[in-house]
Amino acid sequence: MKKTLCKIFLLSVAIGMLGQPIISQAKENVVVMIDPGHGGTNLGANPTGYVEKDMTLITALAMKEELEKYQGVSVYLTRNSDVELSLQDRAQMAKNVNADFLYSLHYNMSANHVFYGAEIWAQSMGTNYAKGYSQGQLLLSEFITVNDIFSRGVKVQVGKSGNEYYGILRYASKLDLPAVIVEHCHLDQAFDAEHFNTVDKLKQFGRSDATAVAKYFGLASTSLKVDYSHYPKPNIEPPTQPKTQDLTPPELATLQVTEVDSVNKTVSIQINATDRDTGIMYYSYSTDGGATFEPLQIWPSATDTLTIRVPAKFGQNRSAIAAVFNCYDGMALSSPVNY
């Protein structure tokens, strides 16, 4: 397996290794470009009546409003209305104002509608990777603390050509512009629904985004009475080789019956799972031989084992199977165990 470490002005197109924490120090004026994803006929994710293009704009406007409460920062938007823009134009807008960072805001959806949580996509190479990974960690930390969102981590994805898989990151890289994609949560998963079901919650994501940006750049705000000029941000060393995604599933997933409780009619089953590259993120299990599976649950960090307790129907043959998923949603199935 390959090793991975799992920002209102509308502009015209005419006019891109964990170390010791370092102290954020604001330059004389920071320039941030916030990109509300999608727009126009490009709706984005809309699985349950929510439309991503509208949600990203609400979040972006709130992010801009909050960031402008800080001194020493100029904040721009790629769009402030429902218009369609190409990914290349969005990156070029950021470059035209000499942005220090481009933040592409999104809400997520998975192909099988089973995953949940927030994730950050960073560029895969050099100083842009280091900046994106550091900023991504601060963003996720805010989401965990303020929004109570599960973190899916900071990730990279490289296409078959060896360039960035995601267009906005690819065009930003060509312009030597640091950028991240911020996927705030999943719109197609009930587990995340409570985090995006009101306008104020969408705005809160924007405020969290702004706080993470302020911490990254070491900004201060008189009105908010905060000063992040000495905030310790993650120190990420630029990689000598491009980072790549984890394309392999977890190495191990096994089951073992550890207890049969005939009084309460339950069986305890231990799940053992490992993924040395990106770690185990979710697990699920079936008690009908794989015909149906329970909703995904969060795998406890820093452990290779957990125990589930399932109902037992004595006199009937039952078969349990576990499914475990790593940071890149790679899945491994255990062999069945009868009980």
Where are these regions (language model features)?
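Long, low-complexity serine/threonine/glycine- and acidic-rich segments characteristic of extracellular
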Residues: T248, Q256-Y339
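Catalytic-core environment of secreted peptidases
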Residues: N29-T48, Y103
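Glycine- and acidic-residue-enriched helix-capping/strand-helix junction motifs
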Residues: G44-I58
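Bacterial N-terminal signal peptides that target proteins for export
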Residues: M1-F9
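Sec-dependent signal peptide cleavage junction
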Residues: Q20-E28
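Bacterial N-terminal signal peptides
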Residues: I8-G19
